[in-house]
């Protein structure tokens, strides 16, 4: 989860200055476009269903599009077959997307073009600093290589930060303030091993797809500061943001593939969807057992409200964990 020292909620929920109003001051498109962008490092689990369902319901409640993108830019972390199982799970749970699925592994040319543009504008540079050096500095890069004019060989590429984002507005959490060191940091946009950085690929693809609002888990609050800065330096409209509470395991840790969260079951999707709606504190139909999947989701769309969503994460219901584990063999 995001450390309080890095990102903090404002005690005053009003925006204090233009820096925190950056998303809302951008263009206001007529069409809502949301998205769900999982990485194929494992199967979907209850925690990722929360993010998928929340983004889906928000998009459909606005009468907008809901896109799906597979973020497969880190081959060492990918699990064979996970991408197709993720898509199958979304369909099984009734979360049908609009348009074709985009795979980041097929978008390298766009990322290279963006890197070239940033270089031509003097907005990037090569860096050879190691993780251990940055760790010794307290975790934030200090700009050591900024004016060293290093060659490309064996170096990462960093964004030359010109528009630091000290605060941004989240529709659920209100005004969020970033640690100045995080806001001012020249972050990596291409890794030393040649792989494109997550923040670069996300911004390039969201801009390409015309995404107007990003609904995702609260574990991604910290990268939002960097992504908004990159949007601005690339002169792209900045989307609005909603960061949902995280589903936690019994130890209080985020449900994740790294923490061995069980995959979603292949049985009747409605009980798990009901658990997800309860987690988000959404209104439920009185006799949901009598509704088919389509009608259940339609009810959820028609009654979707951000006001009810809790601000903090919560332990996943035991029955949900047991149900997922008992159905593991079906996946």
Curated annotation (Swiss-Prot):
Gene Ontology cellular-component annotations: cytosol
Enzyme Commission code(s) on record: 6.1.1.-
Residues annotated for L-glutamate binding in this entry: 35-39, 71, 198, 216
Cofactor dependency: Zn(2+)
Residue segments, region Disordered: 1-36
Binding site for ATP: 257
Residue ranges of the motif 'KMSKS' region: 254-258
Family the UniProt entry places it in: Belongs to the class-I aminoacyl-tRNA synthetase family. GluQ subfamily.
GO MF term (any one): ATP binding
Comp. bias regions, Polar residues: 1-30
Keyword Translocase: no
Species of origin: Yersinia pseudotuberculosis serotype I (strain IP32953)
Protein name from the UniProt record: Glutamyl-Q tRNA(Asp) synthetase
């Amino acid at each position: 989860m995001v450390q309080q020292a890095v990102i903090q909620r404002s005690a005053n929920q009003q925006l204090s200055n233009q820096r925190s109003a950056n998303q809302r001051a951008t263009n206001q498109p007529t069409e809502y476009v949301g998205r769900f962008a999982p990485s194929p490092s494992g199967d979907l689990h209850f925690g990722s269903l929360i993010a998928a369902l929340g983004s889906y319901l928000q998009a459909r409640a606005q009468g907008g599009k809901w896109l799906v993108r597979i973020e497969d830019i880190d081959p060492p972390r990918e699990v064979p077959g996970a991408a197709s199982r993720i898509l199958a799970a979304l369909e099984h749970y009734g979360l049908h997307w609009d348009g074709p699925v985009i795979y980041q592994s097929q978008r390298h040319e766009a990322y290279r073009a963006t890197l070239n543009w940033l270089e031509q504008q003097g907005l990037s540079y090569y860096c050879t600093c190691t993780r251990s050096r940055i760790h010794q500095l307290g975790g934030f890069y200090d700009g050591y290589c900024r004016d060293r004019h290093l060659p490309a060989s064996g170096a990462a590429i960093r964004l030359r930060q010109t528009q630091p984002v000290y605060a941004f507005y989240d529709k659920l959490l209100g005004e969020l303030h970033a640690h100045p060191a995080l806001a001012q940091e020249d972050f990596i946009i291409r890794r030393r091993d040649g792989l494109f950085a997550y923040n670069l690929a996300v911004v390039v693809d969201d801009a390409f797809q015309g995404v107007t609002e990003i609904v995702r888990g609260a574990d991604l609050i910290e990268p939002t500061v960097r992504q908004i800065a990159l949007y601005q330096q690339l002169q792209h409209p900045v989307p609005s943001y909603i960061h949902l509470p995280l589903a936690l395991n019994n130890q209080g840790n985020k449900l994740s593939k790294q923490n061995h969260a069980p995959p979603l079951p292949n049985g009747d999707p409605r009980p798990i969807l009901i658990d997800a709606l309860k987690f988000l504190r959404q209104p439920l139909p009185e006799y949901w057992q009598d509704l088919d999947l389509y009608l259940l989701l339609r009810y959820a769309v028609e009654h979707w409200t951000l006001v009810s969503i809790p601000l903090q994460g919560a332990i996943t219901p035991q029955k949900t964990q047991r149900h997922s584990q008992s159905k593991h063999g079906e996946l």
